[in-house]
């Protein structure tokens, strides 16, 4: 394998940038997720403001066998998402916040199966705009998994970590 050595200035710059990313990446990820959940949650308090509200309301109504009407479902979902957003902003109760997030994501994916004619033009390869909106949530789930890996004090390291195993 050929490796080329970078000039000294480039290596120093690369190390500084990598160090900055390691120091701030998790915080920025947490805040970015918080913005998404808070913003989308607040939209659900205003009828017609969220492009996903009709599908979300029908999904919850279907999952609860009609016990929770669509308008009530949207208010519950709005509070739920705002709570997740605030928890992420404040970096408080992260285990509970991430649990709420994962449960919400399970609910978010169900329209792909409950309403495939609305979420795909050709099932399962060509999603509609609503389907794409749902499928992109894999990025949110992956981000939450990364944050979850830090609830016990884990962190990012800008340098390789060599694990030593007891012999």
Task: List the model feature ranges, each with a label.
Residues 1-167:
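Membrane-interface extramembranous regions
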């Amino acid at each position: 394998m050929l490796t080329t050595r970078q000039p000294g200035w480039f290596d120093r710059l690369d190390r500084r940038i990598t160090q900055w990313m390691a120091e701030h990446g998790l915080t920025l990820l947490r805040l970015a997720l918080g913005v998404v959940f808070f913003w989308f949650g607040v939209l659900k308090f205003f009828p017609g403001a969220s492009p996903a509200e009709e599908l979300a309301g029908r999904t919850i109504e279907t999952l609860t066998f009609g016990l929770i009407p669509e308008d009530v479902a949207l208010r519950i979902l709005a509070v739920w998402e705002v709570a997740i957003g605030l928890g992420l902003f404040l970096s408080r109760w992260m285990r509970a916040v991430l649990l709420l997030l994962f449960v919400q994501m399970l609910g978010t994916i169900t329209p792909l199966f409950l309403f495939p004619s609305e979420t795909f033009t050709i099932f399962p390869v060509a999603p509609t705009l609503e389907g794409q909106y749902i499928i992109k949530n894999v990025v949110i789930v992956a981000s939450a998994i990364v944050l979850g890996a830090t609830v016990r004090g884990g962190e990012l390291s800008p340098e390789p970590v060599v694990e030593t195993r007891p012999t």
